[in-house]
Structure formats: C-alpha cells, structure tokens
Curated annotation (Swiss-Prot):
Belongs to the Integrator subunit 13 family. There is a cross-link at K611 (Glycyl lysine isopeptide (Lys-Gly) (interchain with G-Cter in SUMO2)). It comes from the Eukaryota. It is found in: Nucleus; Cytoplasm. It comes from Homo sapiens. Widely expressed. Tends to be up-regulated in seminomas compared to normal testis. Keywords: Cell cycle, Cell division, Coiled coil, Cytoplasm, Isopeptide bond, Mitosis, Nucleus, Phosphoprotein, Ubl conjugation. This is Integrator complex subunit 13.
C-alpha cells in the first residue's frame, strides 16, 4: 500500500476573531539607545504584540523550517477563520512558499477588535480544513495514476494545527466532536467522488494561546485516539516567545527532526575589526544525520537545546582542517538544514559564508585523543546541506588487527571453528510456518536467536583456553549437545564418547594441552585429564535444561568421573613413581655434567704438560753437551696412545673440540730428521765431525775428543 504519512498534508487554522487582537502582554523594547542619549529626550515606550501576530509569526516559522528541510512532498494549506473560512493557498507546489503565504496574510490584515464576536467562530476554519484534506494533491494523483485499477491503495492522511483562544475544556471537546463529525460526513462524499479521497487518518493539534500573566482555562492533554480515524492532543501555551518555542518543538516532532549546535564559530566583531569572538548557531535537520552517534552510543555529545527544546542537541565544533582538500573525507549522507534563529547575526554570517561556496568541517568535542571529523556544512545549488562523513573504518581498508585482543596473535584464535560456527548459524528465508508445542506460531527470527544463544553458552575463542574442542574424540558429543532435543542415538553417541575418554585416561594417552606461556613440561598427565573432565562437565551443564536426555548425558559423565577407590590408589602410586623418576633423572643429569667438567679439566692439564716438554726440547737440542735424548715415539703415533678414559655420560663440548685440534696439529707437524734415520730408535750425533776429523764414534754413539 502506498502510504502518505500525516506529514504529507498540514492544514493551519488560525483564529481571526476579535479577541485575537488582544495584547499578549509580553513587552518588547523598541528604543534600544541606552548609551550616549541626549538629556531631555523621553525614551519610547515598550510595545507588545497581539495574539494574532504571535500566532502568525509562530506558524510562519513552522512553515519556514519545513520548507527549508522538505521543499517537496511536504505541503501546507493555510486557513483563516472568523465569520467564515478564508483559504489562503492550495495544495499545488507553486503555492508552497513563504512569500505567497505572507502576501495572503498581509491582505487579510489583523482582526478587528470592534467586530461582533458572536458572528465569528473557529468552527468555520475546522470544517474547511477537513474539506481541504479530502482534496487530492499532485503527488497523490501521480501515485493513483501509476496504480490505475489499484488506485484505492493510495493512502490519504493529514494533520490539522488549530491556533485559537478556547474558553474551557468543554469548548475544546466541542471542537473535537465537530471535527470528528465533519470527517465522517466528508468521507461519505469522497467515497462517491473521483476527485476526493477519504481521510484514513487525521491528527488534530489544538493550541490554546492566552496572554502572559493570565491563568489558563484549558488543560494540556497528550495524544488521545478519539476514533479509528481521528487522534487529538491539546496544548495550552502562553503567547509570545513561549508559543514560538512550542511550534518549534512540534515541527521537530512532526517531521522527525534533530538539532545540532555548531560551537566556536570565529566571527569578526563589528565594533573591533581586529578582534574576533566565538559564537554558537543551532541548526535543525533530519534525525538520520545523527544515526552514527546513536549507533556508537556517544551520549556525551548531547546537550540541552536552546529555549528548553524537548530534544537534546548534538554539539559539534567548528574545525579548521590542515588541508583544503575536502574530498579526503567521503560522505555517507546529506541533509538540508534550517537555522533555529534565522535572523540572528551569527546565523546570517554562517549561512552567507556557506552560500559563497565555502565549506566547514565539524568535529566531535573530545577531552582526549585525536579529533574526529564527523560532519561537514556545504551548499549546493543555493541550498545548505549537512554532510555526514564516515568517521569509522572504511570497508576498503584492511580489517583491524586482533593481535591486541584477548587472544594475542591471530593464529591463537579458533578461526576454522568459528567459520564452521557461522555456517551453522546462517539466516535463510523461512517459507513454511512452524508452530511451537503450545500451538503458537514460531517466529523464524526468534528461533534463530534462540539457536545462536544455545551455541554460544560455552564457546571459547582461543585455542589455549580449551582442551575438549582441540580433541577429535569429543566432536561427536560437542556437536549434538547444543541441540534443543536429543534422540536415543544421540544419547548413545555421547555415552560412547565419554567411555572412549575414560579408556584414553586408563591408557594414559597424551592430551592436546597448550603450554604457551608456561615454563617446564606443563601440567602432569593426571592434571591434564582433570582439566579435560572439568571443561566437558561445563559444556554439558550449559545445556542440561534443554531436555531430559541432556540430563542422562550429564549423569553418565558424572558416573564416569567418580572413580573407584582402587583406581584412586593406583593414581596416587603412579604420581609417586613419577616424582621418584623425576628426582633420579635430575640426579643423573647433575652427575653427568660434573663428570664431563672433570674430564675436560684433566685433558686440559695433559695438553699443557705436553706443550712444556716440547718447549724444553727446542731449547737444548743445539747444545754440544746435550744429553742423549730420551726415547720418544713419533707424534704421528699419538693416536695410538691410550686415551683418557671416557665418561659413560655425554662428552663435553671442550673434550670434543680439544681432540679435534690435537688430531689436526699432529698431521701438520714435520717429523725430526734424526728419528726418521735412526736405527732401533737411536740416532748418531755429529756425523759431520767424524767425516771431517777422522774421529771414531764410540759404540754408544758418543764422540771422544783427542
């Protein structure tokens, strides 16, 4: 059904009876020259507006805001009521502007206070308003033409705002009854006409205005449904600025508007051209411009609106960007704006600044952290728009890193399991209706939420936080325990899984326990199984209330966890034996380390003594009185000498390196020439002297002198 909301048609009915010429009694200072006044000049007396003037100004302000933000498809019809109804404009788009309305109101003029009040009534205007609502607008006619034979599907709704001076609450009820009867009669006429439409819904807003200082004879009343077609609400408001504030509040309610206050606007002072001051300007726009604030929950941005408005205003600061490239910020929405105080100097300066082709970036006020530019003011085609800039992460950027979250590195998360979890909880169209046990219709969305709640009752996000979800043996139980109801086969599979875990514990099979962040070998095998059983019990207990069969699974689990006394005794003996093995293993390791150190020290001493002997031999080998050299074996045969007894434990790194160096040096050493030519390992000395002097050597190889 093509529905036009109540905001599509708005009819203003303003009372033009003689009592509306009465003063509102709210004085306005006419003579503002309080300084440098010449003595002897009498100041002008303050003036006050009439109830009629206050009503016209407030209604015009209502229309101005509506036309600024909704130049199309939001229509206003203005009616003045005295001795008859005077319709000032029509539903055509050409008549929808302030100039036409103000020219028509000027032609009507103020009410005549000397006219006969008995001949004047607001009822004439209310009847004309109902008749006007039955007329078809251009947009409704276009929609009916497109639908052709289904033209009756186009809706017709509207709103009547009546500003009058009622006498009492009974007078207000009489006006409501008149409107209700008139709607009923005109709906009958419209049913038989091709040029009229029946009123499907009408909102009647009665505003009782009275002079300042008087007591109100009419009580306020919130919106009340008088019939399926008519709803009514009553507002009792003092004239003057109070009436203007009330109309400002109503226009925000009727058209879903929100308020934004621009703070810290730098402006030149008129008196001092070299100085500037900061001003604030409040703007009205559609509430969708604040959707991001509502989603993010930034409640601290709100503040009280001017004149005690019913809604809070969002405060944004004038921002001076470091770059002139506005295209760096991409826009997600643009909404027309309307200043609340359009005639004030700050509002005028801001609008002129924007209409000259300038743009203003707006940032969220923050006590700490970097600035967040969330909105921008700019004009297009002579109209000012509030642009919403995306202050969140762009979908084109890389996703944020989760390394700073609870899991640490990305690989620590159960990413594969989470993908399977999402696949099992996808939303799909649900065509066939389903019913609950009690016979009520089951809503697919609620059923999906309930399933998601069941699957997330116990679902660790990090691999190191779980044991059972890392075990393939637990999958048959974990996959079915989240169901709303279990079959006998499901219960049997769960019991088999539990018995399989008991068998694993009896065999002392290892478990996939994460040791990240722990020192040593981690928890003992008995402690690992205790952790596993506790986690499995937590999972089953999270779903125990689903059905009776879930209770049977828990009973089986608890029965298997309660071990017999001999089993506990065996576990204790096993733990004692493990402790003894750990102690003996530690003692053996300490002994082997000490033994290796002693062997390395002994080998080091042998090598040092060998170096000393070689040095002494070098010193005395050229001396004529040198004694007979001791019997020495060739160095090449050092490998044949008995090695230092190796320890039964592992050889130290020093021993391995020393042996390697000694072997390499022995192969590089040039052997002594006498040892190479010796007989029976004995070499004859000074043979060249014998050859020169003819001396003979003794038997033992020593030369004798003559």
């Amino acid at each position: 059904m093509k529905i036009f909301s109540e905001s599509h048609k708005t009819v203003f009915v303003v009372d033009h009876c003689p009592y509306m010429a009465e003063s509102c009694r709210q004085h306005v200072e006419f003579d503002m020259l309080v300084k440098n006044r010449t003595q002897g000049i009498i100041p002008l007396a303050p003036i006050s507006k009439s109830l009629w003037t206050c009503s016209v100004e407030s209604s015009m302000e209502y229309c101005r805001i509506m036309y600024d933000i909704f130049p199309f498809k939001k229509l206003v019809n203005f009616i003045v009521s005295d001795s008859g109804a005077h319709v000032l404009n029509s539903w055509t788009q050409e008549d929808q502007n302030l100039q036409e309305l103000m020219a028509a109101l000027a032609a009507v003029g103020p009410p005549n206070p000397r006219a006969d009040p008995e001949c004047c009534s607001i009822l004439h205007g209310l009847v004309a308003a109902v008749e006007t609502l039955c007329k078809i607008t251009e947009y409704q006619h276009e929609a009916r033409t497109l639908l052709m034979e289904n033209a009756e599907r186009v809706g017709n709704r509207g709103r009547i705002i009546c500003i009058t001076n009622a006498k009492s609450d009974s007078h207000v009820r009489m006006l409501e009854d008149c409107v209700q009867e008139t709607i009923h009669e005109h709906n009958k006429l419209a049913a038989n006409s091709d040029h009229l439409m029946q009123i499907q819904k009408c909102e009647l807003v009665l505003i009782h205005t009275y002079p300042v200082g008087e007591d109100s004879l009419v009580s306020d009343r919130s919106k009340k449904e008088l019939s399926p077609v008519l709803t009514s609400e009553v507002h009792s408001v003092r004239a003057g600025r109070h009436l203007a504030t009330k109309l400002n509040i109503l226009v925000q309610q009727h058209f879903d508007l929100a308020s934004t206050t621009i703070t810290n606007i730098p402006m030149k002072e008129e008196q001092h051209a070299n100085t500037s001051a900061n001003y604030d300007v409040e703007l009205l726009h559609h509430k969708d411009a604040h959707v991001d604030f509502l989603k993010s929950g930034d409640s601290h941005l709100g503040g009280g609106s001017r004149e005690g408005s019913f809604k809070e205003t969002i405060t944004l600061k004038w921002c001076t960007p470091r770059t002139n490239n506005i295209e760096l910020h991409y826009c997600t929405g643009a909404y027309r704006i309307s200043p609340v105080d359009v005639n004030s100097r700050p509002s005028s300066c801001l609008t002129n600044f924007l209409l000259n082709g300038r743009s203003v970036l707006l940032e969220q006020p923050r006590k700490s952290g970097s600035k967040v530019i969330s909105h921008m003011l700019s004009s297009h085609g002579g109209e000012i728009f509030l642009h919403v800039l995306s202050s969140s992460r762009s979908i084109l950027e890389d996703p944020p890193s989760i390394s700073e979250g609870c899991g640490g590195r990305v690989t620590d998360y159960r990413i594969t399991d989470f993908g399977e979890f999402m696949r099992e909880n996808r939303l799909t169209p649900f065509l066939d209706p389903r019913y609950k046990i009690d016979g009520s219709l089951e809503v697919p969305l609620e059923r999906a939420k309930d399933q998601l709640e069941k699957h997330t009752r116990y679902w660790p996000m990090i691999i190191s936080q779980t044991t059972i979800f890392n075990m393939q043996a637990v999958v048959p139980l974990a996959s079915v325990i989240v169901k709303e109801s279990l079959t006998e086969e499901d219960v049997l599979n769960c019991q088999k899984t539990i018995y399989n875990l008991v068998d694993m514990e009896r065999k002392n099979d290892p478990l996939p326990i994460s040791t990240v962040g722990t020192r040593g070998k981690g928890p003992k095998r008995d402690e690992q199984y205790r952790i596993m059983w506790n986690e499995l019990e937590t999972l089953v207990r999270a779903h125990i209330n689903n059905s009776e069969k879930h209770q049977r699974v828990l009973e089986c689990l608890m029965a298997c966890r309660s071990k017999p006394p001999e089993e506990e005794e065996r576990k204790k003996r096993g733990r004692k034996r493990e402790d003894k093995e750990d102690k003996s293993e530690k003692a053996v390791k300490d002994y082997e380390q000490e033994k290796s150190w002693q062997d390395s020290e002994r080998l080091k001493g042998i090598l040092e003594r060998g170096k000393e002997e070689l040095a002494e031999a070098e010193i005395i080998k050229d001396s004529p009185d040198s004694p007979e050299p001791p019997n020495k074996k060739p160095l090449v045969e050092m490998d044949e000498t008995p090695q230092v007894e190796k320890s039964k434990g592992p050889v130290s790194l020093l021993s391995l390196w020393s042996n390697r160096i000694n072997t390499a040096n022995s192969r590089k050493h040039q052997e002594f020439a006498g040892r190479l030519n010796s007989v029976n390992n004995r070499a004859e000395l000074y043979q060249h002297l014998k050859e020169e002097n003819g001396m003979e050597t003794t038997e033992n190889g020593k030369a004798s002198r003559q």
